[in-house]
């Protein structure tokens, strides 16, 4: 039920975004601006229009709709890690405090369960990748946003600055950060 409620809220935000962007938070504007046509159709409730007008079986429609829905869920999860990943960063080497549960970073919040982990999703070039399994995506998100360094940048109002930081975070391999190559200014 919570997932449907979240999706309804996102659909309402999207409707408002289409009417008047000024009433929407900049983070959501950025998210909606980046949506593919298929994901936008899903948010508008036009899932029947996601498939081309070729005569395809309802089974194919169902699979394509599920793929699109999972891809949208993956994009929501990426957005959540960009906003709140720093809250889960490993900043306590002595482990003196217990790591808090962050619902926004839980795939179940977006309707992703254990059965979905091996499903491929389209993430449209994020991390230089177009398609990836949800399990692999979560691994990358954890590595980039929840490692030994926490990065908080989504509050920055200037989209150009925010995109620059995001590009720097998401286009360096985490394993290279502290190598000689990784320390060089890019």
Question: What is each stretch, according to the model?
Answer:
Residues 1-186:
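Conserved internal helical-beta-strand scaffold that buttresses enzyme catalytic cores
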